[in-house]
């Protein structure tokens, strides 16, 4: 059986490395990506207890430069970028006029006239066109640098110790959602951001996307983290890690059919900053008393795994909602899920049912995130 990737799928610069490591490869949003190497549970636990290394080069990078770049970002994204300091990033989202999601993003402020928006892999082309078209009225230049960088995520409680071996940058000075430039693995002007999608401490670094450089840095990170039990990690562990941390995934918890209040992401939506795409529709949601449904966390009481799309039933066995993501939680050793239910049912400790193979299986609504990383000891 051939192990070569289908020609139609896009590849990161590390594709051959993943295959040599024996990774199980899958089609993820049109990309040939590793879903697991040694196994999902081992990779998940390495990130929770030590350190893991992810290739996340399929993510997109859109830069806005010019005197109108802040105004453009403010118009396109729901968070308030005027509050960002140089060297700071924040979580945000781009919305359709009806207040539903184009995509969720991370916005980085390079300078007063220079911003980077990191977008999701499966929506790269759509997102770029959305940003480009909506930035047109503003005095800024939009550039798609998605293919110029290999993006590596070094995640876990030993991530800082691992990366510290490869750079002279004072990593302790880079607080959560902050970034700087420095030399990593002898590569100058490397972007080093204290960000991630795992619920753990960690860093994402951006390096040139040529295969030789990408492979060298990948191998040097693995060598640096060897004493901490580092393992290469695939998208499977990335998904269970983000689910334990109740982080949204586009196409599941957020989509063009789900609005900000339903998703519970209104803390990142600054309606008081002025008008932006989607703001008027969201003000109407507020005026009408809030959303009709809400995203909740579920913990299975009875045996069973709630999967994406499974129906949520009320106490009279009527379908009232649906599961957006569900899985065994390797670190928590529980079966968990995220689901949409009517607002009147979205109360903690309420028991509901998830329909699994035509059988109602009992679950409880619980607080999210399911997992919070331990606070560092003084």
UniProtKB/Swiss-Prot annotation:
EC number(s) stated in the UniProt entry for this protein: 2.1.2.10
The organism's place on the tree of life at top rank: Bacteria
CC annotations in GO: cytosol; glycine cleavage complex
Disulfide topology: none
Keyword Transmembrane appears in the UniProt entry: no
UniProt KW keywords: Aminotransferase, Transferase
MF terms (GO), sorted A to Z: aminomethyltransferase activity; transaminase activity
Stretches assigned to coiled coil: none
Subunit structure comment from the entry: The glycine cleavage system is composed of four proteins: P, T, L and H.
Family named by the database record: Belongs to the GcvT family.
Reported function: The glycine cleavage system catalyzes the degradation of glycine.
HAMAP family in the record: GcvT
Protein name: Aminomethyltransferase
Gene that encodes the chain: gcvT
């Amino acid at each position: 059986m051939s192990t070569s990737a289908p020609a139609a799928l896009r590849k990161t610069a590390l594709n051959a490395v993943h295959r040599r490591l024996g990774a199980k490869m899958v089609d993820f949003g049109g990309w040939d990506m590793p879903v697991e190497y040694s196994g999902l549970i081992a990779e998940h636990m390495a990130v929770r207890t030590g350190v893991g290394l992810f290739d996340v080069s399929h993510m997109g990078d859109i830069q806005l430069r010019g005197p109108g770049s802040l105004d453009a970002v403010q118009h396109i994204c729901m968070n308030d970028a005027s509050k960002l300091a140089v060297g700071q990033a924040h979580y945000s989202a781009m919305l359709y006029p009806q207040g539903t999601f184009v995509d969720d993003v991370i916005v980085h402020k390079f300078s007063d006239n220079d911003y980077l928006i990191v977008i999701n892999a499966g929506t790269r082309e759509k997102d770029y066109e959305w940003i480009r078209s909506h930035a047109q009225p503003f005095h800024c230049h939009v550039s798609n640098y998605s293919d110029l960088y290999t993006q590596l995520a070094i995640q876990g409680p030993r991530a800082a110790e691992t990366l510290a071996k490869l750079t002279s940058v004072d990593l302790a000075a880079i607080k959560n959602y902050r970034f700087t430039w420095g030399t990593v693995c002898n590569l100058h002007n490397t972007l080093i951001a204290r960000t991630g999608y795992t619920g753990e401490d960690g860093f994402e670094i951006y390096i040139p996307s040529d295969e030789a450089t990408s492979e060298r840095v990948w191998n040097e990170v693995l060598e640096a983290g060897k004493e901490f039990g580092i393992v290469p990690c695939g998208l499977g562990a990335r998904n269970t890690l983000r689910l334990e941390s109740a982080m949204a995934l586009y196409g599941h918890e957020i989509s063009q059919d789900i609005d900000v209040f339903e998703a519970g992401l209104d803390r990142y939506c600054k309606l008081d900053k002025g008008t932006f795409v989607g703001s008027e529709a969201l003000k109407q949601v507020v005026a009408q008393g809030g959303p009709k449904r809400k995203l909740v966390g579920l913990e299975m009481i009875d045996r069973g795994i709630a999967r994406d799309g499974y129906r949520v039933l009320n106490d009279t066995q009527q379908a009232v909602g649906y599961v957006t993501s569900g899985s065994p939680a390797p670190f928590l050793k529980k079966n968990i899920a995220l689901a949409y239910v009517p607002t009147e049912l979205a109360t903690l400790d309420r028991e509901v049912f998830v329909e699994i193979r035509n059988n109602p299986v009992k679950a409880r609504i619980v607080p999210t995130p399911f997992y919070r990383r331990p606070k560092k000891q003084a």
